[in-house]
UniProtKB/Swiss-Prot annotation:
Record organism: Neisseria meningitidis serogroup B (strain ATCC BAA-335 / MC58)
PANTHER family membership: TRYPTOPHAN--TRNA LIGASE, MITOCHONDRIAL (PTHR43766:SF1)
InterPro entries, alphabetized: aa-tRNA-synth_Ic, Rossmann-like_a/b/a_fold, Trp-tRNA-ligase, Trp-tRNA-ligase_bac-type, Trp-tRNA_synthetase
Subunit-level organization: Homodimer.
Name of the protein in question: Tryptophan--tRNA ligase
E.C. number(s) listed in UniProt: 6.1.1.2
GO molecular function: ATP binding; tryptophan-tRNA ligase activity
Gene Ontology biological process terms from the UniProt entry: tryptophanyl-tRNA aminoacylation
């Protein structure tokens, strides 16, 4: 029985925070340990430059994201871990797929439609004002990322479902027009994946400014946790889990029995200040070893580069084999 292929891409436009760890990194690392799964994880730096035009940010984020995944337990021996820009076969496939993709399909992409709508609301006569081709056609690049390794499943958030559906559409069009070479990928949505709340109770997000950094030291983590909003109840007054986002964050770092005990402590009047100390201790305990590893990797980025180059060599070997078949299918062949 062949293994199921799962492919995940991570953009390189920021430094991962605690919400990324709980919602994406931790579950993905655990899933990659499944013996029935063949995992591919890539740093989507070409996707990153679609919106981010700051070279140093792209460069620094690539290092930080790679170090984060490795520090959090990603095993490059079990997962093909590579940088998108190190696999030129993906970009060649991107062009071939661009040549068979209907413009109307791209017109329906959510990101493009949102840009057009924003222009209309702002009174712009040109609906495409400010729209660059990277934004317009990036679903095709995402399709190339997926099809290059014939992934069976692509874990995505609900806002990304459309892109996997587009990948299926484009793969089907190629298979029908030329040759059956591509697997039709399936969306994978894990309903049990936690969406961590931030300091203010909304989803933890850089755009909200409510994040808890992942790689700060113990004291700074405590300072961040101290900013979690709470009500004015005094020590000794009973408190309910839904009265502060603190409880949901605590739950993400605790066993079910520990969560039950914490609920009881709140009901018995645990002071918010003490509750925050308990939470910070939980976070710091789980991240102690990953933080040490992260600091080692970022102090010597050549370690990261070596791992990425090894992953790229592995990825390219496989990509080349499929791309040769694709080129042959569309008529790009040696002259004999």
């Amino acid at each position: 029985m062949s293994k199921k292929r799962v492919l995940t891409g991570v953009t390189t436009t920021g430094i991962p925070h605690l919400g990324n760890y709980v919602g994406a990194i931790r579950p993905a690392v655990r899933a990659a340990q499944n013996l029935d799964t063949e995992s591919f994880l890539f740093l989507a730096d070409y996707h990153g430059i679609i919106k981010c035009h700051e070279p140093e940010m792209i460069h620094q984020s690539t290092q930080a994201v790679a170090a984060t995944w490795l520090a959090c337990g990603l095993d490059p021996e079990r997962t093909t871990f590579y940088r998108q820009s190190d696999t030129p076969e993906v970009m060649e496939l991107n062009w071939i797929l661009t040549c068979i993709t209907a413009k109307g399909l791209m017109n329906r992409a959510h990101a493009y439609k949102a840009a057009v709508q924003a222009n209309a609301e702002n009174g712009q006569e040109d609906p495409d004002f400010g729209v660059e081709m990277g934004l317009f056609s990036y679903p095709i690049l995402m399709t190339a990322d997926i099809l290059m390794f014939n992934a069976n499943e692509v874990p995505v958030g609900r806002d990304q479902i459309q892109h996997v559906e587009m990948a299926r559409d484009i793969a089907g069009r190629f298979n029908h027009r030329f040759r059956e070479l591509f697997t039709l990928p399936e969306v994978k949505i894990d309903e049990n994946v936690e969406l961590l709340v931030g300091l203010d109770g909304r989803k933890m997000s850089k755009s909200y400014g409510n994040t808890i950094p992942l790689w700060e030291n113990d004291k700074k983590t405590q300072k961040s946790v101290n900013k979690i909003i709470t009500n004015m109840k005094e020590p000794g007054e009973p408190k309910q889990p839904d009265e502060s986002p603190l409880f949901e964050i605590y739950k993400a770092f605790s066993t079910p029995s520990e969560t039950v005990e914490f609920t009881k402590m709140l009901a018995d009047g645990l002071a918010w200040g003490e509750a925050k100390k308990l939470l910070a201790a939980k976070i710091n305990a789980e991240l102690a070893e990953p933080r040490e590893r992260y600091n080692e990797l970022t102090a010597d980025p050549s370690q990261i580069e070596e791992i990425l180059q090894a992953g790229a060599a592995k990825a390219r070997k496989e990509a080349r084999e499929l791309l040769d078949k694709v080129r042959d299918a569309v008529g790009i062949r040696p002259l004999k």
